[in-house]
Amino acid sequence: MPRFNQRHAPRACAALLAAVAGLTHAAFANAHAVVGDRVFPATMTVDDPGVGDEFDTQFGHIKTSDDNGNGINVNTVSYEWDKLITKNLAFSVASQYVSQNAPDGGSAKGWDNVTLGVKYLAYTNPAHEFMASVGLKTEIGGTGAKSIANPYSTFTPAVYVGKGFGDLPASLGYLRPFAITAELGPNLTTASSDQGPNSLGWGMTLQYSIPYLQQQVKNLGLPQPLSNMVFVVEAPMSTCTAGACSGQTTGTINPGVLWLNRYGQFGIEAQIPVNRASGNHVGVLFDAHLYFDDLFPGSLGKPLF
């Protein structure tokens, strides 16, 4: 489900955070992003193509620099709640609490703006493990702390796709657990190009699912917790399209691992800046994600209509 995108985090570290963002098959039967035999897990910084009833919390830590080159430690705690309106249409609300601490003792703390979203699962092809969704996220300017949040709003219409490699021939069986997902959408602000330039948000993930390997290719008898792991590399990026930064791309490469069960998932990823404009330090993300459609199928996990 929609990841809370950290590109709208504190202005002091905007350059780096611009982009940032062995069970049985029945155990995953109600997971939210399922097409054919493929389960796309909820990734941390690149939104997956599914919709569902779920709740996500995430902790992030990274060291970056302000405009004067001073080092700043940035800690974030974010949440996102997704609610199905119908089986193919979901609404979301998200925000994050940000704490910036500079070596000279200066600090800024508070909530970032609230982000509202809507997402529609538009197409699935089970035979080819492909699914696509469209959505709109709106960061509502001025709803967060003045020291942290942007005073302007940002609208992000986006497309989300996922493709599993399960349709490869049997001779390439050990490649079938691979999958890719991607998202693409402009970030359109209500500010001037100097204060809040527009940008193009884009990202991809490469995944290798051990549960898929065990269930659909060959049961190797791998023990817990390895049998429930999905290894992933995410690449959340943002390319400035206006103002003085026009043409500049920032982002991170995030290698990590997700551990899934029927009711949710846990994950950890590193954040490695792709260039100097993105930062000089490696960060870390921790994530806990609950599937309300499995935990509370008759209440919180049930579509409204």
Segments and roles (model prediction):
Residues 21-28:
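N-terminal signal peptide c-region/cleavage motif recognized by signal peptidases
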Residues 2-15:
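Bacterial N-terminal signal peptides that target proteins for export
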Residues 29-305:
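Transmembrane beta-barrel domains of Gram-negative outer membranes and organellar outer membranes
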Residues 8-10, 27, 34:
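Compositionally biased, intrinsically disordered low-complexity segments enriched
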